[in-house]
């Protein structure tokens, strides 16, 4: 069975290409975007619309509530089940998303890491509350600069987890290097969209403005009400800024600007991650769907398996 993966930075057109390939190949789409697993966070995560979901079946959207956890190991297990079901129906599984850790876990397995340390976790969360999340991120940067560079300073959940791992004696980067992700769990065609930077930034900026005009503020308002103003530590980009605007802490243009900058930085991290993957076929627009459909179904030569 051939697995098709459509990856790339945010706003690069992954959903549109995945749907076009699904319609051409008779496929179903498996989400690999860590932000789109949350229920009720639709506009701010650019989740496929009802029309897009009607154009091709989608899996692994709306799995957990905001504030609940989802990690790469759990994602890979859920994706394995979805892919098996798609294959059993005689359809082509198409994985689409920009979360590199999820794609890597699915294609090459998961690193075995130390378990949770509740005492350390509590101490780090207290430090973040007292000194700010960037202070805890700086602690990670001191012990594992490479891991810190891949995690947003405000993503306290991932920062704390990385420090938990480092406290076990080996940093996350050391564990990843030792694992090396050599195992190929699937025969996969990995496509990565690669629009010119100026074009990508323009698309990001336009998308963020459309989010603010199209319901992001309503979603942030609902979160504020649900969590009584104390938003979960790990939310997709944009919700904290939208909530700050609703509280009168940011004017609208500044909130939009900050979210645009955050998405551009996220896109850069996504590209850096993908550049490290093996066997990536970088695709520049415009996309010839017919040619790509033929290409992804061609068996890989044994030498590059």
Swiss-Prot record:
<keyword id="KW-0460">Magnesium</keyword>
<protein>
    <recommendedName>
        <fullName>tRNA dimethylallyltransferase</fullName>
        <ecNumber>2.5.1.75</ecNumber>
    </recommendedName>
</protein>
<dbReference type="GO" id="GO:0052381">
    <property type="term" value="F:tRNA dimethylallyltransferase activity"/>
</dbReference>
<feature type="binding site">
    <location>
        <begin position="8"/>
        <end position="15"/>
    </location>
    <ligand>
        <name>ATP</name>
    </ligand>
</feature>
<comment type="subunit">
    <text>Monomer.</text>
</comment>
<dbReference type="GO" id="GO:0006400">
    <property type="term" value="P:tRNA modification"/>
</dbReference>
<keyword id="KW-0808">Transferase</keyword>
<comment type="function">
    <text>Catalyzes the transfer of a dimethylallyl group onto the adenine at position 37 in tRNAs that read codons beginning with uridine, leading to the formation of N6-(dimethylallyl)adenosine (i(6)A).</text>
</comment>
<dbReference type="InterPro" id="IPR018022">
    <property type="entry name" value="IPT"/>
</dbReference>
<dbReference type="InterPro" id="IPR027417">
    <property type="entry name" value="P-loop_NTPase"/>
</dbReference>
<dbReference type="InterPro" id="IPR039657">
    <property type="entry name" value="Dimethylallyltransferase"/>
</dbReference>
<dbReference type="Pfam" id="PF01715">
    <property type="entry name" value="IPPT"/>
</dbReference>
<feature type="site" description="Interaction with substrate tRNA">
    <location>
        <position position="99"/>
    </location>
</feature>
<keyword id="KW-0547">Nucleotide-binding</keyword>
<feature type="site" description="Interaction with substrate tRNA">
    <location>
        <position position="121"/>
    </location>
</feature>
<dbReference type="GO" id="GO:0005524">
    <property type="term" value="F:ATP binding"/>
</dbReference>
<keyword id="KW-0067">ATP-binding</keyword>
<feature type="region of interest" description="Interaction with substrate tRNA">
    <location>
        <begin position="33"/>
        <end position="36"/>
    </location>
</feature>
<feature type="binding site">
    <location>
        <begin position="10"/>
        <end position="15"/>
    </location>
    <ligand>
        <name>substrate</name>
    </ligand>
</feature>
<comment type="similarity">
    <text>Belongs to the IPP transferase family.</text>
</comment>
<keyword id="KW-0819">tRNA processing</keyword>
């Amino acid at each position: 069975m051939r697995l098709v993966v459509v990856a790339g930075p945010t706003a690069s057109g992954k959903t549109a290409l995945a749907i076009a390939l699904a319609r051409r190949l008779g496929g179903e789409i498996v989400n690999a975007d860590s932000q789109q697993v949350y229920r009720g966070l639709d506009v701010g995560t650019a989740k496929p619309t009802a029309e897009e979901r009607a154009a091709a079946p989608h899996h692994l959207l709306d799995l957990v509530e905001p504030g609940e956890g989802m990690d790469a190991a759990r994602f890979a297990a859920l994706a394995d089940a979805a892919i098996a079901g798609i294959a059993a129906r005689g359809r082509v599984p198409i994985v689409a998303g920009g979360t590199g850790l999820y794609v890597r876990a699915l294609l090459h397995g998961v690193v075995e890491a130390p378990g949770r340390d509740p005492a350390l976790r509590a101490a780090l969360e207290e430090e973040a509350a007292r000194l700010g999340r960037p202070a805890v991120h700086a602690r990670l940067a001191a012990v594992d600069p490479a891991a810190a560079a891949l995690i947003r300073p405000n993503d306290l959940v991932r920062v704390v987890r990385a420090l938990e791992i480092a406290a076990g004696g080996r940093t996350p980067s050391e564990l990843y290097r030792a694992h090396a992700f050599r195992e190929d769990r699937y025969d996969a065609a990995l496509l990565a969209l690669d629009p010119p930077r100026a074009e990508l930034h323009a698309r990001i900026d336009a998308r963020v403005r459309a989010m603010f005009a199209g319901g992001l503020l309503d979603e942030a308002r609902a979160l504020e009400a649900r969590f009584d103003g104390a938003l979960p530590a790990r939310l997709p980009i944009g919700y904290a800024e939208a909530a700050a605007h609703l509280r009168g802490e940011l004017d609208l243009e500044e909130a939009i600007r900050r979210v645009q900058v955050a998405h551009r930085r996220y896109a850069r991290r996504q590209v850096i991650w993908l550049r490290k993957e093996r066997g990536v076929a970088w695709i520049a627009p415009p996309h010839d769907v017919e040619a790509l459909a033929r290409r992804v179904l061609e068996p890989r030569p044994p030498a590059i398996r």
